[in-house]
């Protein structure tokens, strides 16, 4: 058993969970997978529907080349095998928001094969999640049940939108690992520009496969590849937040354990997560591939990719999160933690690098990942919309470096910057916050303090830790403007503290 595997205590012994995810990522494209209809969030019902999307008679699908390029780019970003020949199939099922009566997907010949995603846990350790495949498919429309008590309305704006379904192997063993995997996958997709990763809008959602087994059984499965060593899995559909992913997994694992410990049998089924109640509920029995009667779509030729075209896409890939993190650590001397915080968002990392030019990079990272990030998070905004340009953070750090202000005063200056009072240097001048570096002025404050506290001055020789009180009093006397390093140095000299 891996030391990171979570053991769940049951009445009849220990259990472990086994998790695999199918992540549906909406392709960042201006038009749909097989039609020229626009893709956008917030349009009125059925405003972005073509005759192809509505499955009108005689309308034929035409493959969107850009969506194929986005899928290839994603596959390369996942270190996956790009299949030069793939095929589109019809997945047959009936639902009101699927006007064709089938979904165009990819069954046994997907565009992308096996890959891998390296994921970091909260404690800094890493694990790999193997990618089984990535395939392109159409999204369905949306059924609206709350518009009329006697009817269901259908909005086909989403119908035909391109999705990438990214299927993982069952390599995750805790709910925290599953959430961390989705976070990392989202970061990669956003870096690549192939999906905007907005989970609130449904552009990234996960189907979570959960099963439980006894300790040691998972290792047997990994050694043999035989699923008989694992329990029956249930799929939780369309979970669209990291927190809900964790909650759904924890509840479902407990539910399955209770059934098994009561002597029952877990049914393979599709379930939904109810975030209000924090529980999963049955949706339908889980279908197998043969239930969908897959067959090649006769309206679409096999998809054959030119190796040179794939190579040209690979050459345009941006620097991805893992490579960027390693570079930030080596180039700027950042800690793994700070680099990890910065690379969560490419714009965040770019902001840091722009601010760090010619400055103390570690100090810049500290301001970006702490004060600025906290303010942006509280305001619910991102670095792209930061009211403080990177030049302001760079100037603030410069004022600290050249001794114009102390780190303590810098925090006060930062608050005024955030309030929109101007650039750092202007605020320092306007508010008279320049640090006192004049040793004469500092010595006078120290002499006055010692003269007024002779007993404490004598006692500090035996209790050097009491020096902090003197430092605090001098800083207070100078309005926090005295250079802390100079204060410390002069106090030690005058009080005879080594």
Curated annotation (Swiss-Prot):
This protein's record includes keyword Nucleotide-binding: yes
Leader sequence range is none
A single GO molecular function term of this UniProt record: glutaminyl-tRNA synthase (glutamine-hydrolyzing) activity
Q: Which GO terms describe its biological process?
A: glutaminyl-tRNAGln biosynthesis via transamidation; translation
Keyword presence, Cell inner membrane: no
Q: What PROSITE patterns does the database record attribute to this sequence?
A: GATB
| SUPFAM superfamilies in the cross-refs | GatB/YqeY motif, Glutamine synthetase/guanido kinase
Q: Provide the reaction this enzyme catalyses.
A: L-glutamyl-tRNA(Gln) + L-glutamine + ATP + H2O = L-glutaminyl-tRNA(Gln) + L-glutamate + ADP + phosphate + H(+); L-aspartyl-tRNA(Asn) + L-glutamine + ATP + H2O = L-asparaginyl-tRNA(Asn) + L-glutamate + ADP + phosphate + 2 H(+)
Looking up InterPro entries in the UniProt record yields:
Asn/Gln-tRNA_amidoTrfase_suB/E, Asn/Gln-tRNA_Trfase_suB/E_cat, Asn/Gln_amidotransferase, Asn/Gln_tRNA_amidoTrase-B-like, GatB, GatB_C_1, GatB_Yqey_C_2, Gln-tRNA_amidoTrfase_suB_CS
What PANTHER family does the record tag this protein with?
GLUTAMYL-TRNA GLN AMIDOTRANSFERASE SUBUNIT B MITOCHONDRIAL AND PROKARYOTIC PET112-RELATED, GLUTAMYL-TRNA(GLN) AMIDOTRANSFERASE SUBUNIT B, MITOCHONDRIAL
Q: How does it assemble?
A: Heterotrimer of A, B and C subunits.
Q: What does this protein do?
A: Allows the formation of correctly charged Asn-tRNA(Asn) or Gln-tRNA(Gln) through the transamidation of misacylated Asp-tRNA(Asn) or Glu-tRNA(Gln) in organisms which lack either or both of asparaginyl-tRNA or glutaminyl-tRNA synthetases. The reaction takes place in the presence of glutamine and ATP through an activated phospho-Asp-tRNA(Asn) or phospho-Glu-tRNA(Gln).
Q: What is this protein called?
A: Aspartyl/glutamyl-tRNA(Asn/Gln) amidotransferase subunit B
Which gene is the coding source of this polypeptide chain? gatB
């Amino acid at each position: 058993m891996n030391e990171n595997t979570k053991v769940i205590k049951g009445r009849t012994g220990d259990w472990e969970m086994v998790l695999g995810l199918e992540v549906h990522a909406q392709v960042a494209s201006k038009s749909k997978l097989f039609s020229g209809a626009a893709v956008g969030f917030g349009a009125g019902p059925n405003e972005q529907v073509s005759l192809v999307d509505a499955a009108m008679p005689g309308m034929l699908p035409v493959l969107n080349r850009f969506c194929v390029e986005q899928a290839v780019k994603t596959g390369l970003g996942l270190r996956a095998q790009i299949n030069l020949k793939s095929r589109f199939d019809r997945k047959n099922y009936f639902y009101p928001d699927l006007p064709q009566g089938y979904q165009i997907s990819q069954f046994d010949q997907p565009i992308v094969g096996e890959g891998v995603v390296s994921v970091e846990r909260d404690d800094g350790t890493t694990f790999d999640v193997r990618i089984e495949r990535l395939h392109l498919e159409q999204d369905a429309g949306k059924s609206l049940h709350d518009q009329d008590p006697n009817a269901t309305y259908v909005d086909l704006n989403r119908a035909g939108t391109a999705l990438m379904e990214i299927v993982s192997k069952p390599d995750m063993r805790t709910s925290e690992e599953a959430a961390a995997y989705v976070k990392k996958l989202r970061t990669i997709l956003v870096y690549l520009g192939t999906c905007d990763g907005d989970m609130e809008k449904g552009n990234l959602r996960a189907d979570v496969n959960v099963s439980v087994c006894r300790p040691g059984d998972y290792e047997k499965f990994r050694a043999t590849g035989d699923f008989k060593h694992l329990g029956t899995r249930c799929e939780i559909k369309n979970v669209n937040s990291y927190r809900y992913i964790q909650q759904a997994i924890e509840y479902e694992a407990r539910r399955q354990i209770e059934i098994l410990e009561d002597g029952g049998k877990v049914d393979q089924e599709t379930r939904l997560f109810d975030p209000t109640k924090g529980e999963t509920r049955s949706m339908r029995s889980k279908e197998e591939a043969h239930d969908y009667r897959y067959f090649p779509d006769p309206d679409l030729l096999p998809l054959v990719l030119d190796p040179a075209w794939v190579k040209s896409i690979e050459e345009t890939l941006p620097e991805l999160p893992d490579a960027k993190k390693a570079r930030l650590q080596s180039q700027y001397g950042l800690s793994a933690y700070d680099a990890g915080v910065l690379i969560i968002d490419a714009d965040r990392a770019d902001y840091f690098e722009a601010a760090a030019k010619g400055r103390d990079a570690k100090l810049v990272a500290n301001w970006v990942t702490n004060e600025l990030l906290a303010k942006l998070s509280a305001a619910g905004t991102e670095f792209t919309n930061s009211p403080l340009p990177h030049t302001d953070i760079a100037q603030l750090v410069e004022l600290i470096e050249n001794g114009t202000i102390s780190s303590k005063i810098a925090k006060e200056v930062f608050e005024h910057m955030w309030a929109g009072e101007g650039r750092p240097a202007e605020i320092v001048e306007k508010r008279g916050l320049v640090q006192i570096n004049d040793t004469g002025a500092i010595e006078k404050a120290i002499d006055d303090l010692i003269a007024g506290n002779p007993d404490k001055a004598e006692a500090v020789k035996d209790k050097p830790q009491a020096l902090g009180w003197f430092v605090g009093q001098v800083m207070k006397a100078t309005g926090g403007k005295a250079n802390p390093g100079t204060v410390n140095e002069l106090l030690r000299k005058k009080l005879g503290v080594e």
